[in-house]
């Protein structure tokens, strides 16, 4: 006796001894078959192809439009947007420039530097020189200049205790500074003023210094300062050997700051958006899935795999380009 598959109105597979009934059930329940296929969340060859193509597109954007700081087409656009943000923030805090300085970001930065002074902003002194602190790397080594929770903690600590805290050569170093009088009548108000002072000072450094030539040295990417702890390894840096911390510092000095970090994120965002868009359209148009099942969320294992493949392809293209450009140097 032969057994045939039958699918009921709910899309469940049953077994029947009637061959014609099983065949008719399969024919009459095409939508249930589609739903069964979708619910399995398995990638097919088209999904793999989509992921790879999207990754290559992201890689091409990275190679031809991102490039390196200083000659990046997307980087110039990103820098301009950051300049606009800094000028808008300055206006919100009282910057009222003359007509000739309305679009002058240096004027806006100078205003913020004067308004949001901090005690830990020294970059040149005898003590600073002893730990290798320079105007080019003090945003990297000074923990209070980091745009993350670590930076906030050390900024409040330094403002309340009149100190500066640095990471250098794998060591945590604290220096005494001049006394800074925080505004506010009690601890809570002083804490609030300290937080806002930190934000304002970060904005004054976001687009570089008012005295710097060119784009200047901005802020580090969030948690990038922790590379200062990596005082190990031997890597080629312009015909010299250096630790991982030295590589990170040199990269920051060469323009890999938070602004360029935003630029480098654009190919990643584009790759993810393309994969999610095509994945959603395919489910909606080809598989006739309900709209709620076409929303790209992490619960879909096939989408997670597609994103992994797409980003892996992007990283591979980027790594190949970096290897060719570097010629064996890490920078």
Regions found by a protein language model. Give the residues of each.
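Glycine-rich, hydrophobic membrane-spanning regions of integral membrane proteins that mediate transport
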Residues: 1-331
């Amino acid at each position: 006796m032969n057994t045939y598959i039958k699918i009921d109105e709910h899309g469940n597979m049953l077994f029947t001894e009637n061959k014609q009934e099983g065949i008719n059930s399969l024919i009459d329940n095409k939508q249930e078959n589609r739903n069964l296929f979708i619910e399995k969340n398995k990638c097919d060859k088209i999904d793999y192809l989509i992921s790879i193509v999207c990754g290559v597109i992201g890689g091409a954007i990275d190679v031809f439009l991102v490039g390196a700081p200083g000659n990046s087409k997307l980087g110039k656009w990103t820098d301009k947007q950051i300049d606009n943000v800094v000028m808008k923030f300055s206006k919100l805090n009282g910057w009222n420039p003359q007509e000739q300085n309305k679009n002058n970001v240096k004027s806006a930065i100078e205003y913020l530097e004067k308004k949001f002074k901090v005690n830990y902003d020294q970059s040149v002194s005898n003590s600073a020189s002893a730990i290798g602190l320079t105007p080019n790397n003090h945003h990297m080594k000074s923990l209070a200049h980091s745009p993350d929770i670590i930076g906030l903690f050390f900024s409040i600590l330094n403002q309340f205790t009149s100190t500066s805290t640095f990471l250098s050569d794998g060591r945590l170093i604290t220096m005494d500074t001049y006394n800074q009088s925080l505004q506010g009548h009690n601890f809570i108000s002083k804490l609030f003023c300290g937080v806002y002072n930190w934000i304002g000072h970060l904005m004054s450094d976001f687009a570089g210094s008012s005295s710097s030539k060119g784009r200047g040295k901005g802020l580090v990417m969030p948690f990038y300062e922790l590379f200062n702890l990596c005082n190990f390894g031997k890597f080629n840096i312009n015909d010299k050997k250096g630790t991982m911390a030295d590589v990170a510092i040199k990269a920051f000095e060469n323009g890999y700051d938070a602004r360029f970090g935003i630029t480098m994120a654009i190919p990643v965002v584009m790759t993810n958006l393309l994969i999610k868009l095509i994945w959603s359209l395919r489910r909606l148009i080809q598989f006739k899935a309900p709209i709620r099942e076409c929303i790209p969320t992490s619960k879909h294992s096939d989408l997670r795999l597609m994103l992994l493949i797409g980003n892996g392809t992007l990283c591979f293209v980027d790594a190949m380009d970096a290897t060719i450009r570097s010629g064996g140097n890490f920078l």
